[in-house]
Amino acid sequence: MNKYNYMENVLQHINANVISLRDDEIKGNNIILKEILNIIIDKLKTKNIMFRKMYTCIFFGGSYYDGLRVGHPNEFDLDLLLTLHNLTKPIITKANEPGYVFLKLGNINNFLNIDDFKMYKQLSNLINKNGYLDVRKVLSWFEGIVTSSLNDIKEGSIYNFQIKGNTYKGTIHKGGPAFTLKIKGPNGSNMDIDLVPCFRFTEEHWPQGFKKSTSQQKSFFIVPKPLPDSTKSHYWRLSFQEQERELINNKGRLKPALRLLKQMRDTLNHHRIASYYLKTVFLWQVEEIGVDQSHWNSSLSYVFVCALKRYKEFLDSDNLPYFWEKKNNLLSGLHEDTLKNIRGSILKVLTDIESNNKDPNAIVKYLLTPEEQKRIMNGGNPQQSANAENGSCLSM
């Protein structure tokens, strides 16, 4: 018998009534998002011939489309996937920064001298003197074509998107690899859309030194995430989002448990722990558990506590290895005092779980703020109002 069943209904209630996204919000925001993206992509393809040639599709990434979003469905991470012509002879090699690679265009000069490929001439402005694709130059190029393409809908610093008779006002903000389009709707709704230009490669370019995927998804992305050192502007961050999505899909209680862990992170103010770190805990669990689905089909309380304990083990070792390259410790950038405080908090949570096994509400203070507790838990006894099916993850 699962000794954590005493808090099962509480976890189900919180997952269903606090964490899970509202269907009406999801549907409404998806309609608006699709219309805005259609406008942007059409204008980019019309105004820039090289973008039109390289663009393939949008990858809808991030926690929202992984079914892991906590809160409101108003933040979207979108990768605009670009491809390079084979005749440029792209060569990907591992960089000396963990998680990064170099991309060299081995035949770029000969390629650009072919009359049929003159539309790619802007590529020569995106590489450094040694033929490596430059992150900052690519981001500058992308910023330029976005702003110039949207000029005809711009008034001052505001971009006006006309959708189904309504005006949605947008502003563009830069941060890291993303250009964030902040949208304000006529009804007061807000939406943040992160657009990132990424390059997509097939399996034959899989970089050495990174774990080989057994996934059905064989392509991977490189992301223009700049390093602080300006001399390293040809370092590209690897992204295996398609493989990770496949690994965590169809795993029973995995997604509800991960959403609970993210909710706990937010409630405890562990802001230095990125959502991707928590996702990585589950990626390692998926590999360690293997093909047996019985673990993920167990109760939500059991799957959640097992993940919390595994998370604590990583914290205790001061090492959370990047799933695709074990030598890359995701916790290396955290100060020891920060890690010590986080370890202490998680130990206290686990101690309360083990010692208060007759109090199903003992876990609540770690998952809900005082305001959330009043708003949600006063609606009725969670032991009676929730059932096991409320924890089902949302599919997109």
Curated annotation (Swiss-Prot):
InterPro entries: Mab-21-like_nuc_Trfase (IPR046903), Mab-21_HhH/H2TH-like (IPR046906), MAB21L/cGLR (IPR024810). GO terms for biological process: innate immune response. GO terms for molecular function: 2',3'-cyclic GMP-AMP synthase activity; ATP binding; double-stranded DNA binding; GTP binding; metal ion binding; RNA binding. GTP binds at residue 194. Keywords: ATP-binding, GTP-binding, Immunity, Innate immunity, Magnesium, Manganese, Metal-binding, Nucleotide-binding, Nucleotidyltransferase, RNA-binding, Transferase. Its EC number is 2.7.7.86. Mn(2+) binds at residues 286-287, 292. Its cofactor is Mg(2+); Mn(2+). Nucleotidyltransferase that catalyzes the formation of cyclic GMP-AMP (2',3'-cGAMP) from ATP and GTP and plays a key role in innate immunity. Acts as a key sensor of double-stranded RNA (dsRNA), the presence of dsRNA in the cytoplasm being a danger signal that triggers the immune responses. Directly binds dsRNA, activating the nucleotidyltransferase activity, leading to synthesis of 2',3'-cGAMP, a second messenger that binds to and activates Sting, thereby triggering the immune response via activation of the NF-kappa-B transcription factor. This is Cyclic GMP-AMP synthase-like receptor. It comes from Aethina tumida.
